[in-house]
């Protein structure tokens, strides 16, 4: 997507489209409810989060710049499963918990090299902590065993983008884009502790430089008709399958292993419709939006692919002078055979300020 009144952080080449007389601020928050289902058991989890804040402006002729903070990944769950073994061994309870996340601050620039061609780059700093644990307890045994995983990240993130925009005729514009994200070692030393809760006996493992980012590739296209109808679609690939990941081995150690991760493929499509962009009636100037998405899992569980993800979203953008209030709802369904099924309902609120800060006033 390439528009002068919207910040598209997915492709830094789009920053060159920002108008020379405006400054764009975009902030967003979200709230969500997730339902976890396994067999007859159901658990609900609620949370809210500050999503992003970005600002974009014209730096030089044909050069736009963007700065901001974005989420990279978020973890938050606490789930227990109890299995009845038999009358001798009683019941076994497994509790899975996780918290934390990674965020990135970035500085990006887009340069319009030729009238149809733009290139860009995002340079970011990625940081955060993630903790996970699996605790096993039994009704017939005193000992409880916990496996605790933790890692911290403090590294860089680098993405490149290119866009080609072509006016097909008087009323239609085609935009093609592509991005590449650079994969690299994160310099993080993941830790695993195996704790016997009853006698406080702890075995600690640590792997030096054990986490990496994958190479990522994406291509997309959008069609703009009379500035009323915008249709867009994109495809992305994350090459997790080429990376090893730390895990407990069959021998009991914490080592790097292959085959735990797999390549992630994602397809998304969306529509943005405005009845009358210059109409006097507010309802005719509202942006009505709808989108669909599908993603394959990037990990295996006991040799079986994780849950596939299907998403659907709808929302609208309400113009307020030169700015825009964005309201959206999203449903995300993730499921796989013999695994937990997740249904997430999310509300997104965003406000885009588009202010004419750099206009020169003339007094006669």
PLM-predicted stretches and their roles:
Residues 1, 58-364:
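Outer-membrane beta-barrel porins/channels
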């Amino acid at each position: 997507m390439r528009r002068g009144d919207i910040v598209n952080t997915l492709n830094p080449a789009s920053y060159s489209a920002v108008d020379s007389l405006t400054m764009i601020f975009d902030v967003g928050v979200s709230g969500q409810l997730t339902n976890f289902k396994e067999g007859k058991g159901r658990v609900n989890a609620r949370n809210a989060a500050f999503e992003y804040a970005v600002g974009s402006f014209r730096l030089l002729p044909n050069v736009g710049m963007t700065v901001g903070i974005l989420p990279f990944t978020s973890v938050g769950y606490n789930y227990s499963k109890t299995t009845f073994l038999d009358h001798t061994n009683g019941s076994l309870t497994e509790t899975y918990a996780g918290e934390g996340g990674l965020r990135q601050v970035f500085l990006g620039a887009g340069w319009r090299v030729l009238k149809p061609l733009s290139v860009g780059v995002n340079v970011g700093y990625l940081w955060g902590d993630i903790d996970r644990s699996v605790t096993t307890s039994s009704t017939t045994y005193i000992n409880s065993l916990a496996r605790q995983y933790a890692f911290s990240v403090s590294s860089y993130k680098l993405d490149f983008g290119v866009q080609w925009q072509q006016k097909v005729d008087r009323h239609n514009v085609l935009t093609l884009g592509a991005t590449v994200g650079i994969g690299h070692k994160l310099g993080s030393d993941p830790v695993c502790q195996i704790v016997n809760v009853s006698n406080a006996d702890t075995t600690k493992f640590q792997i030096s430089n054990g986490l990496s980012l994958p190479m990522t590739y994406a291509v997309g296209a959008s069609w703009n008709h009379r500035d009323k109808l915008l249709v867009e679609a994109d495809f992305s690939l994350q090459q997790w399958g080429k990376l090893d990941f730390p895990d407990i081995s069959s021998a009991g150690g914490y080592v790097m292993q292959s085959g735990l991760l797999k390549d992630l493929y994602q397809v998304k499509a969306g529509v943005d419709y405005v009845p009358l962009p210059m109409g006097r009636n507010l309802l005719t100037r509202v942006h009505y939006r709808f989108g669909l998405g599908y993603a394959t899992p990037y990990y295996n569980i006991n040799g079986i692919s994780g849950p596939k993800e299907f998403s659907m979203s709808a929302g609208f953008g309400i113009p307020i002078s030169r700015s825009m209030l964005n309201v959206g709802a999203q449903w995300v369904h993730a499921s796989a055979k013999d695994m937990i099924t997740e249904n997430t309902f999310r509300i997104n609120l965003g406000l885009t300020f588009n202010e004419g800060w750099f206009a020169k006033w003339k007094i006669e």
